[in-house]
């Protein structure tokens, strides 16, 4: 490190103390000498006085930053002037210490800057190894969806810590632990999903979103904006939570996506408040769309929302629904948002994350950008903070709206191909299929031969569903190799996994 102070000779005890702790300390008595030393050496840290002959500390700092903009700096000075503190903060000085300071104070400040990441990385490693066994023990005692949510949040928090501080090679262990948990989760869903669909009040599944989170606010004459970001995973929500908390008070909860964990089922359920079998009974055209595997299965969400408002006797509310599937459409929404703020209920559907998941299996460039879960998190986080969406969120935080952000389902990176026996009329999904007499190994799939028990549409005789479990995906034997090369290691949805089914709900109000 380099210590710059015109009275450096008075600081010899401090320098000796730092050297006894293993630091090498160079010194300078003025800013010009410090500038020369900085050009000729690569220091890890600068200790800097403000009041010196010639150029002062802030001028010296500007010269130093020209050479290395990211070098950390501790300012140690007698001055308590607030303007100097403000200037130091604006110049991204890491710490500001006021003389006199003890050797130990300076050592602690240096250690916090130079060794912080290493200390946190080591502690993260040891803490995870302790929690590893506790997670495995807790896995044996799970009896409810709340237990699963709590466990999954712990796993996601470890993923985020490894993203930030390094994983010391533990990412693979965490990945294997998540796979193990997913196997147990799949068994839990197979055994309990039918019961979850029978709950009429406070349903945790997709049809309960409106009644649980929006209706209480609407009945209290509060303005509400629901934002459904298609295919956004829990880890992607939590990675931007600190940023959102700078704008909103946030209550974090969850819901469970319907099976199959796909947009035609779960997102329609959010806006209609209906299960898929109820939906096709109330809206017969939906049945035709399903039977023909047609596009546009979600094009009536606006009508579904209005009908749901009517069923709950709040149809007098002014409503605006908007679906955004392209950047330009998002920019248009941003330009007109002040008009939409006159409404009582805003509904916004955003397809960016879903398109990213689908396109990453088709484009080599996206495969490079989103090679794994960490890359996926980083890409979504960057989009949140740098797109039109960020402007919209900031405007909403300053409005009188309560904002409910959620997703219809998540996604999972698939790695295990399994063969399916089906006729040519079966649906084309990678993680789920429906049709006549579908068959596969039930070790890696939930085979639903009585769809009506799970509130799924029965679209013909001998009709059944296959729902992939864990990280499996479906292939037909005649095209297996071609599609395996395309789908292996891609992000898909429609099946059973914590990543797909356990979906955060953020209820937010600006400060």
Residue ranges of each PLM-predicted region?
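Two-component/phosphorelay signaling modules centered on CheY-like receiver
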Residues: 8-26
């Amino acid at each position: 490190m380099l210590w710059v102070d015109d009275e450096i000779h008075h600081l010899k005890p401090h320098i000796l103390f730092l050297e006894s702790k293993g630091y090498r300390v160079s010194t300078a008595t003025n800013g010009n000498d410090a500038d020369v030393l900085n050009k000729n050496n690569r220091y890890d840290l600068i200790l800097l006085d403000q009041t010196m002959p010639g150029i002062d500390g802030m001028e010296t700092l500007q010269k130093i930053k020209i050479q290395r903009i990211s070098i950390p700096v501790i300012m140690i000075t007698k001055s308590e002037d607030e303007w100097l503190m403000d200037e130091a903060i604006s110049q991204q000085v890491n710490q500001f210490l006021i003389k006199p300071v003890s050797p130990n104070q300076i050592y602690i400040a240096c250690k916090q800057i130079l060794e912080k990441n290493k200390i946190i990385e080591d502690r993260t490693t040891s803490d995870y190894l302790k929690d590893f066994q506790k997670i495995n023990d807790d896995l044996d005692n799970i009896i409810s969806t709340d237990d699963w949510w709590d466990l999954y949040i712990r796993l996601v928090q470890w993923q985020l810590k490894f993203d930030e501080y390094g994983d010391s090679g533990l990412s693979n262990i965490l990945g294997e632990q998540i796979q193990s948990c997913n196997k147990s989760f799949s068994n839990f869903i197979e055994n309990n999903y039918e019961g979850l669909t029978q709950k009429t009040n406070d349903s945790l599944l997709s049809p309960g979103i409106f009644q649980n989170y929006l209706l209480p606010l609407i009945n209290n004459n509060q303005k509400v904006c629901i934002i459904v970001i298609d295919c956004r995973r829990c880890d992607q929500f939590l990675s931007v939570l600190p940023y959102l908390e700078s704008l909103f008070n946030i209550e974090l909860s969850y819901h469970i996506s319907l099976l199959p964990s796909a947009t035609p089922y779960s997102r329609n359920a959010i806006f209609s408040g209906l299960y898929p079998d109820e939906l096709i009974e109330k809206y017969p055209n939906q049945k035709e769309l399903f039977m023909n595997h047609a596009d546009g299965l979600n094009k009536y969400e606006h009508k579904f929302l209005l009908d749901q408002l009517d069923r709950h006797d709040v149809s007098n509310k002014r409503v605006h629904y908007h679906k955004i599937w392209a950047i330009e459409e998002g920019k248009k929404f941003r330009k007109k948002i002040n008009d939409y703020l006159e409404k009582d209920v805003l509904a916004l559907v955003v397809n960016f994350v879903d398109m990213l998941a689908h396109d990453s299996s088709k484009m080599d460039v996206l495969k490079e950008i989103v090679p794994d879960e960490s890359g996926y998190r980083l890409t979504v986080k960057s989009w949140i903070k740098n797109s039109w969406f960020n402007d919209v969120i900031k405007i909403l935080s300053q409005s009188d709206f309560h904002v409910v952000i959620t997703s219809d389902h998540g996604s999972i990176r698939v790695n295990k191909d399994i063969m399916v026996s089906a006729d040519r009329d079966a649906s084309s999904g990678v993680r789920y299929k429906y049709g006549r007499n579908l068959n596969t190994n039930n070790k890696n799939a939930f085979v639903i031969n009585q769809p009506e028990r799970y509130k799924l549409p029965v679209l013909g005789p001998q009709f059944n569903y296959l729902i992939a479990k864990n990280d499996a995906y479906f292939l037909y034997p005649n095209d297996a190799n071609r599609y395996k090369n395309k789908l292996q290691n891609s992000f898909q949805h429609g099946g059973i996994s914590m990543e797909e089914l356990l979906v955060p709900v953020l209820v937010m109000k600006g400060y």
